[in-house]
């Protein structure tokens, strides 16, 4: 998940058994509004179609240091992204998702039985970077089709998270911003036909809640037009390249884009090989945003698109 700046102003259906909702949700979209003068408590009764939170192992560990956020996450549909070789965090119920930036790496891990016990889903994350082969960058739909076949053959669900920077390879001559090229190329629709979950890497737009929401709404509508059963998530970053963002900007992006999506991939990146232009990690930004969403709540979106394998999440402690 990268965060290159390319916003309008500038610039990973679950199988029936996996769709049953067993994790009550608390974080976003389902907290009832507290009476005036009262703060919503951690004991609020919550409907079953709240926002899903897709989080890396590191992000989940950092966010869980805050008691309010930890309590919310414990009653929310949470998907924990692991890299090959990692083990899930102890003491937190989450559905295990293992991430791969390349189909060959996924195929090798499956053939070698190297996925952690309890893995329920695969995240395929194609981007224009050294981790995704050039052939997959040139045809991410074909690569995602192969990833889906591999995942489904092993009883796993698939999340695909195509980066906006793929458009620099797919439509190199266009002067339109990347988000517009992504829509024009119908990438959301084409990948939605293949995958169980589509993650829209919209984090580069989060500094403007209007720009973020406009792209997310249009891409989500495009995806559901192609596959009404697809689950759609949207990306957020507490630390994208460029000017620093704050918690309010993330909260505003969530409030502006919900209920167009079913949840969010909230990333807390630090500078490293997968994000060489990221600023130093700022987990407090993500914590602040989630605290605000817990306290404010979000309206029910009326859809019944549970998180990947969410009924299984309650059984891992």
Whereabouts are the PLM-identified features?
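Glycan-processing catalytic domains of CAZymes
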Residues: 40-317
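C-terminal region of N-terminal signal peptides and the immediate post-cleavage residues
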Residues: 27-45
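Bacterial N-terminal signal peptides
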Residues: 17-28
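Position-driven detector of the extreme protein N-terminus
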Residues: 2, 19-20, 32
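Bacterial N-terminal signal peptides that target proteins for export
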Residues: 4-18
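Intrinsically disordered, low-complexity serine/threonine-rich segments
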Residues: 5-6, 33, 44, 313
């Amino acid at each position: 998940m990268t965060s290159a700046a390319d916003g309008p102003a500038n610039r990973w259906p679950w199988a029936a058994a996996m769709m049953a909702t067993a994790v009550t949700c608390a974080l976003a979209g389902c907290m009832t509004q507290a009476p005036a003068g009262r703060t919503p408590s951690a004991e609020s009764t919550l409907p079953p179609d709240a926002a899903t939170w897709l989080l890396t192992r590191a992000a989940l560990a950092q966010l869980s240091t805050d008691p309010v956020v930890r309590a919310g996450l414990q009653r929310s549909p949470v998907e924990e992204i692991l890299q090959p070789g990692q083990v899930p965090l102890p003491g937190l119920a989450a559905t295990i998702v293992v991430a791969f930036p390349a189909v060959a790496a996924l195929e090798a891990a499956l053939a070698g039985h190297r996925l952690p016990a309890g893995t329920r889903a695969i995240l395929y994350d194609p981007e224009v970077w050294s981790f995704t082969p050039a052939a997959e960058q040139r045809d991410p739909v074909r690569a995602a089709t192969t990833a889906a076949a591999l995942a489904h053959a092993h009883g796993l669900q698939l999340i695909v998270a195509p980066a906006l920077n793929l458009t620099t390879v797919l439509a190199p001559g266009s002067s339109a911003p990347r988000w517009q090229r992504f829509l024009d190329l119908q990438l959301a629709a084409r990948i939605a036909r293949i995958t169980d979950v589509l993650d829209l890497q919209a984090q580069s737009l989060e500094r403007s809640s209007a720009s973020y929401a406009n792209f997310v709404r249009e891409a989500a509508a495009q995806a559901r037009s192609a596959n009404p059963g697809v689950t759609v998530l949207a990306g957020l970053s507490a630390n994208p390249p460029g000017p620093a963002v704050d918690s309010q900007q993330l909260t505003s992006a969530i409030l502006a884009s919900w209920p167009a999506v079913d949840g969010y991939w909230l990333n807390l990146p630090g500078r490293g090989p997968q994000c060489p232009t990221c600023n130093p990690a700022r987990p407090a930004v993500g914590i602040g945003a989630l605290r605000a969403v817990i306290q404010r709540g979000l309206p029910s979106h009326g859809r019944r698109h549970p998180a990947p394998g969410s009924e299984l999440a309650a059984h891992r402690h």
